[in-house]
């Protein structure tokens, strides 16, 4: 390969026009695979030398050249040229300049099809390792915050209406469970990512006596693809990642939506650190939860990346097709988005101020204790449906009078049902309502403590 001559140019009488070439080039984004491409090439050439397909001296020269190129890339001494088409051609051109025609032996028993598939597996494995660590830290932040707020009480909502008072720690632990499931999904995703397609060649394997198990071992893969067609055609592991990322972003978006509400003037449940807020160019008083809004907004682009690749893959015949070039930008974008978003959310949570009294006061001027009264009557042998009807009438009456259940005089309670005693007022407090929810997984303080203890054990 001389100058910018294509790796595949021998069969053609003339080259592509520049604008067509630019349309087909992927170097503007697949340069992000450079480290992984060089790592895979070093493993491949080491195997070629070990198997006697090329001499060990030749393998060592090629390996040294690749290591030099990697250093040049890290030091930003290499300019990525769109005429190279992709990162593989860039590296091979650089290798040719460093060691001469011997560079051509690197591609022995290998195709760009298994080469790029290997790069993608290595890249995503790297991303998953980083993401799982970040999710672990986010979960630790949630557990620590939940432990601080086991006895902090706020309204629980259904339909965004006050439903029942709950522990703020309980609320936080709900998100801990979501992010734990996310972590489990990404761990399973790793199983399908931690596989080596290297050696599948274009689609049918190779006639050379390669050792695929050796290259898999050198690259740290746990398993081989056992069908060469599948090896170069498979993008399931990327789709799984994008689907899992969509679920993760959905969970973060839901949390951020609540944070946005909680920081509003109407709620004032929490205040975000200045480090995660911005202001207004015209309204001096504003402190906006922009980072939470951006996580909510960026969820849409992650969804889009998932559906984009699903659509690319839906009608592709085996094996490799140029359509598969479209697997990269969405993956890179999603990976970069979620890695930062997880850090942002962890940072917001670990630095935000929780206004306990405001949360508690929000449970005092509502009817979120109505279920307590219904349960109170049911515990005195009244059928729950009858109790529900009676309490509903009391809520209606109190609403008309501008009072709440705890404000109703005992004589009026007894007029509705003689089963109601003076102890009803203790039952109707928000704290009692929370403490009495002692079923497994409930919001009772002891149950929240149990959830946290289980989480601590899981995180250790």
From Swiss-Prot:
GO MF entries: argininosuccinate lyase activity
Enzyme class: lyase
Location relative to the cell: Cytoplasm
Highest taxon in the source lineage: Bacteria
Entry keyword Repeat: no
UniProt keywords, alphabetically: Amino-acid biosynthesis, Arginine biosynthesis, Cytoplasm, Lyase
A single cellular component GO annotation: cytosol
Pathway(s): Amino-acid biosynthesis; L-arginine biosynthesis; L-arginine from L-ornithine and carbamoyl phosphate: step 3/3
Documented EC number(s): 4.3.2.1
InterPro entries associated with the record: Arg_succ_lyase_C, Argininosuccinate_lyase, Fumarase/histidase_N, Fumarate_lyase_CS, Fumarate_lyase_fam, Fumarate_lyase_N, L-Aspartase-like
Predominant location category: cytoplasm
PROSITE patterns: FUMARATE_LYASES
Family: Belongs to the lyase 1 family. Argininosuccinate lyase subfamily.
Name of the molecule in the record: Argininosuccinate lyase
Taxonomic placement: Bacteria, Bacillati, Bacillota, Bacilli, Lactobacillales
């Amino acid at each position: 390969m001389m100058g910018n001559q294509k790796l595949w140019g021998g069969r053609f009488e003339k080259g592509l026009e520049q604008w067509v070439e630019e349309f087909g080039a992927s170097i503007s984004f697949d340069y992000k695979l450079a480290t992984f491409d060089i790592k895979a090439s070093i493993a491949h050439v080491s195997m070629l030398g070990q198997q006697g397909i090329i001499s060990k001296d030749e393998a060592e020269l090629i390996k040294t050249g690749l290591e030099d190129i990697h250093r040049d890339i890290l030091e930003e001494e290499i300019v990525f040229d769109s005429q190279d088409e992709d990162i593989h051609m860039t590296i091979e051109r650089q290798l040719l300049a460093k060691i001469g025609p011997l560079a051509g032996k690197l591609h022995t028993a290998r195709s760009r099809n298994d080469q790029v598939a290997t790069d993608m597996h290595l890249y995503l494995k790297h991303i998953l390792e980083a993401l799982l660590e970040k999710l672990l830290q986010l979960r630790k932040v949630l557990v620590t915050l939940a432990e601080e707020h086991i006895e902090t009480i706020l309204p629980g909502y259904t339909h965004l209406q006050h439903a029942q008072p709950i522990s703020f720690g309980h609320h936080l632990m709900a998100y801990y469970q979501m992010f734990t499931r996310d972590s489990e999904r990404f761990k399973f995703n790793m199983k399908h990512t931690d596989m080596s397609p290297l050696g599948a060649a274009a689609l049918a394997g190779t006639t050379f006596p390669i050792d695929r198990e050796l290259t898999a071992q050198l690259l740290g893969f746990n398993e081989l693809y056992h069908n060469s067609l599948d090896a170069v055609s498979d993008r399931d592991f990327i789709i799984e990642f994008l689907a899992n990322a969509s679920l993760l972003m959905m969970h973060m978006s839901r949390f951020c939506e609540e944070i946005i509400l909680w920081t509003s003037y109407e709620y004032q449940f929490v205040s975000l650190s200045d480090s995660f807020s911005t202001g207004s160019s015209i309204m001096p008083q504003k402190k906006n939860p922009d980072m939470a809004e951006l996580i909510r907004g960026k969820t849409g682009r992650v969804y889009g990346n998932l559906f984009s690749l699903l659509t690319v893959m839906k009608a592709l015949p085996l094996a490799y097709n140029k359509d598969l070039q479209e697997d990269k930008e969405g993956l890179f974008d999603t990976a970069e988005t979620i890695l930062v978003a997880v850090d942002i959310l962890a940072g917001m949570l670990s630095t935000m101020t929780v206004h306990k009294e405001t949360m508690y006061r929000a449970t005092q001027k509502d009817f979120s204790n109505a279920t307590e009264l219904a349960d109170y009557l049911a515990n005195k042998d009244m059928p729950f449906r009858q109790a529900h009807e009676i309490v509903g009438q009391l809520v209606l009456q109190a609403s008309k009078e501008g009072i709440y259940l705890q404000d109703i005089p005992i004589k009026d309670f007894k007029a509705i049902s003689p089963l109601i005693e003076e102890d009803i007022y203790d039952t109707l407090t928000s704290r009692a309502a929370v403490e009495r929810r002692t079923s497994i997984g409930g919001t009772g303080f002891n149950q929240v403590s149990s959830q946290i203890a289980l989480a601590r054990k899981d995180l250790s």
